[in-house]
Amino acid sequence: MKPPILIIIMATIMTGTMIVMLSSHWLLIWIGFEMNMLAVIPVLMKKYNPRTMEASTKYFLTQATASMLLMMGVTINLLYSGQWVVSKISNPAASIMMTIALTMKLGLSPFHFWVPEVTQGITLTSGMILLTWQKIAPMSVLYQISPSINTNLLMLVALVSVLVGGWGGLNQTQLRKIMAYSSIAHMGWMAAIIIYNPTMMILNLVLYILMTLSTFMLFMLNSSTTTLSLSHMWNKFPLITSIILILMLSLGGLPPLSGFIPKWMIIQELTKNNMIIIPTLMAITALLNLYFYLRLTYSTALTMFPSANNMKMKWQFEHTKKTILLPPLIITSTMLLPLTPMLSILD
């Protein structure tokens, strides 16, 4: 893709997201979603082959269906309230339709089937954009409509998403699919807290984006797409491989890493609201996520593949790419736990 075209496409993606985030009018939000969706499809198809074509088609069909459902919900709401304002949702059916549309856009269960398939079919760079930037717009709308959302529906979706995110990743050897299932689980945690403390959802989203960006950037250094290629990285980049493994444990929510903060805070907030069973179930199902990350760490770090001695010297001569953004991203993705007392300002 030529640089001017790429710049225009990226600018359109950003503009679409910004329109959604800054609008309080349903029509503008819908236009922002459409701009964002149509601009991201060429990014997904950057490396043109049947796999990317299939992934882009799946993405388009899902997002178009979600946009249609959203507009349907908006129209029903308009019929009953006579207003296009986001905060005024007076009809329960409209609220449910909007929630379902946004869960489809986010890839929450039971509308999650497109996420692993699309992520697996595209390049690492496109996957990184899909699992980070593309979550911001739907989450911002969910944040705005959170007072009108059906609590039981969203808690059910959140619980099932955390379960599916953990269960789906258990048998995977493809790193992109593992990241996709991890994304489903993280979105589930965010959906669970959004009604009770929307500000905490933003904290969770920021930490999730930081951890996912760092992990994808490290995968891109060596074009690692499978657990086997990750274990081969020990010979080329021993330090980077060990950082990837720490980041993965952070994504799994292992204390004392940054990924533990949102889980801890969400469980605390839900129990404050007299909810005991749901946070308990979510904490138990989160162990599935941690298990497959631990298994990946074990298979990569502790079971070394046979290699010749000259291979072990390879890292000294390897010309590494420039990684200016990586050090601050890695630090924030792993070492933020001591700053947790500062979160008291959220209350």
Swiss-Prot record:
Membrane disposition: Multi-pass membrane protein
Record flagged with keyword Repressor: no
UniProt keyword list: Electron transport, Membrane, Mitochondrion, Mitochondrion inner membrane, NAD, Respiratory chain, Translocase, Transmembrane, Transmembrane helix, Transport, Ubiquinone
Class of enzymatic activity (EC top level): translocase
Gene Ontology terms, MF aspect: NADH dehydrogenase (ubiquinone) activity
Any single Pfam family the record assigns to this protein: NADH_dehy_S2_C
Localization: Mitochondrion inner membrane
EC number, as in UniProt: 7.1.1.2
Catalytic activity: a ubiquinone + NADH + 5 H(+)(in) = a ubiquinol + NAD(+) + 4 H(+)(out)
Gene Ontology terms: cellular component: mitochondrial inner membrane
Record-annotated membrane-spanning stretches: 3-23, 25-45, 66-86, 96-116, 122-142, 149-169, 178-198, 201-221, 237-257, 274-294, 323-343
Swiss-Prot/TrEMBL GO biological process terms: mitochondrial electron transport, NADH to ubiquinone; mitochondrial respiratory chain complex I assembly
Family the UniProt entry places it in: Belongs to the complex I subunit 2 family.
Assembly: Core subunit of respiratory chain NADH dehydrogenase (Complex I) which is composed of 45 different subunits. Interacts with TMEM242.
Chain's role: Core subunit of the mitochondrial membrane respiratory chain NADH dehydrogenase (Complex I) which catalyzes electron transfer from NADH through the respiratory chain, using ubiquinone as an electron acceptor. Essential for the catalytic activity and assembly of complex I.
Protein name per its UniProtKB record: NADH-ubiquinone oxidoreductase chain 2
Organism this protein belongs to: Canis rufus (Red wolf)
Gene that encodes it: MT-ND2
